[in-house]
């Protein structure tokens, strides 16, 4: 029995960052992509050797944007409000011709998130949430987030997260 795979992987990304002169506003836009092509041969076992050849292609790309506003003081201490959106798509095609098997799958995930993090040298408190819509799931998924941080000294960080 013999096995062999040959891969061709290409990818890249771009990012743009903007910082306001007073650094209270930060904005970024990003995009990346990766393409994979794989030719494979997974030994025949008890089948015809020509049945064991296959090919896989996968194209994945994502794009998004994020905005951060830094408050000098929001309610009880300085904080950063972060909001953003993302979109991710994965297109997979996997063929094993001799086994009469093909996987043709396209996954789209759109996301939006919002969080606020209050912080100073000793304390940090973060609360936020994320909404994800996956094309293979009927409903929107909400993921809450909360974090409490205490730094009694410069070298000790205690965290409680949800």
Place the predicted regions along the sequence by residue:
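Outer-membrane beta-barrel proteins, especially TonB-dependent receptors
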Residues: 1-162
């Amino acid at each position: 029995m013999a096995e062999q795979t040959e891969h061709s992987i290409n990818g890249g990304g771009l990012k743009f960052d903007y910082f306001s002169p007073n650094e209270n506003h930060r904005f970024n836009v990003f995009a990346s992509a990766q393409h994979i092509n794989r030719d494979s041969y997974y030994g025949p076992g008890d089948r015809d050797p020509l049945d064991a050849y296959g090919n896989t292609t996968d194209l994945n790309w994502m794009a998004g944007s994020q905005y951060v506003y830094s408050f000098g003081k929001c309610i009880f201490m300085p904080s950063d409000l972060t909001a953003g959106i993302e979109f991710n798509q994965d297109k997979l095609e996997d063929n094993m011709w001799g086994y009469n098997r093909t996987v043709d799958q396209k996954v789209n995930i759109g996301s939006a998130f919002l969080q606020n993090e209050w912080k100073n040298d000793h304390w940090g408190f973060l609360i936020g949430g994320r909404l994800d819509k996956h094309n293979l799931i009927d409903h929107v998924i909400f993921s809450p987030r909360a974090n409490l941080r205490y730094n009694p000294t410069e070298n000790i960080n205690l965290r409680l997260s949800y």
